[in-house]
Amino acid sequence: MENIYTSAAQLIGHTPLLELTHLEKKYDLKARLLAKLEYFNPAGSVKDRVALAMIEDAEQKGLLTPQSVLIEPTSGNTGIGLASVAAARGYRIIIVMPDSMSVERRQLMKAYGAELVLTPGAQGMKGAIAKADELAREIPHSFIPGQFVNQANPQAHYATTAPEIWQDTDGQVDAFVAGVGTGGTITGVGRYLREKNPAVRIVAVEPKTSAVLSTGVPGKHGIQGIGAGFVPAVLDTKIYDEVIPVADEDAFATGREIGQSEGVLVGISSGAALWAAIELAKRPENAGKTIVVLLPDTGDRYLSTPLFAD
């Protein structure tokens, strides 16, 4: 029987879990450490799930027409995912992004046909959101999916990411670790896993120098994709048991380490999440437990960043 897909959107999801056996051995971890490799999505990141969910939700609600112009403020991966889905569906798309994001991200969005508007990096995501709102007022037929406020974001993870984790581990998952950007991943996955097993520990990861969830104080940091500098509307702040702040240098070092030890090339926020997961796995109370860490994207869009600096 043929197993042939007719659209790139059909390739989104069903990403694999990889046990990080080399890191388990290196750090003498007594817990089992499983990485969900989201770079297996067609446009290379977990945000493919969110992009597809937001566009399909808008289409079902009659909010999009062939004349629609999608405008989205994004630090990168959602823009790449939206550009991919928009290209396949024939929509014009404008991405508004802080100029502090990697040059590879810009090139990838342009490769999918997106138009780019850059905002000052010092303004963070707040600056990009304000500019997107301004453009939406000026451009006819514009629609902002709005990943920071759109409930289709966490719902995508509740409906796809979390069930995949549950099924692939046969329900044997004791802790879930994820970085917080919009908060969609940890909210959606956390809710589903909690419904299945209230004892599952949900751990959020944020940049140490912009520890908004821990301290309420935003700041500059180098971990692209997490640490938006505010508490996003879609984030359920009651869903996580613990927040682990991660230093930029630890995120970079761990991101490099998984490539060189496991043969898996991932991005900066993956390094941050993995550093936190390793710290969790070192704790004596987690001996014999299974920890799942979500690694959001591929490292090849960070080759120009300090992640892979010589």
Locate predicted features:
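PLP-dependent amino-acid enzyme catalytic core
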Residues: 1-310
